[in-house]
Amino acid sequence: NFTEITAKAVLFPDYQDVTIPANIAPLNFMITDSSATEYVVHFQSKAPSSDQLLAGGGEDGKIMIDSTQWRNLLTASKGQKIVASVYANRPSGWVKFKDYSLHVAEEPIDPYLSYRLIEPGYELYRQLGLYQRNLTNWDVHTIYENNRTYEEKNNHCINCHNYKNYSTQDMLFHVR
């Protein structure tokens, strides 16, 4: 038993009503509701197969989605939408927030993203690196790191990196 409310659940990151690629890794998130002690999220495909997935979370609001079930749901839902229903257990009982949708694109996303990771307020040449993230499973691999620890006389900066003609076959980065 639950009471339906008209408010949307507050999610971080907010994935509500967006289009996602069919091969994206599970979009785990947090629900912020100061009075709830547990959560359930029901993902229901609107594709003819009507696949579904349940995910739950405790008082911290963290919703961790099973990767195999997520992949199966997205594969079955290409070009369709998935409706997500969020339930929260409050002291007054279970409530159901307003549903939201995820539209699943038929096209896959390129699996890798490369980026330079630096500290906020970066001032010294230390702990700076180039990394590659797999967007289909969230694995991260190091391309290059200047130092794992600060060394006063042995530091160098890693500057911009780019790909020749936007192709992933050749990459260039500058170290000084």
Residue ranges and their predicted role:
Residues 1-176:
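Sequence signature of WD/YWTD-type beta-propeller architectures
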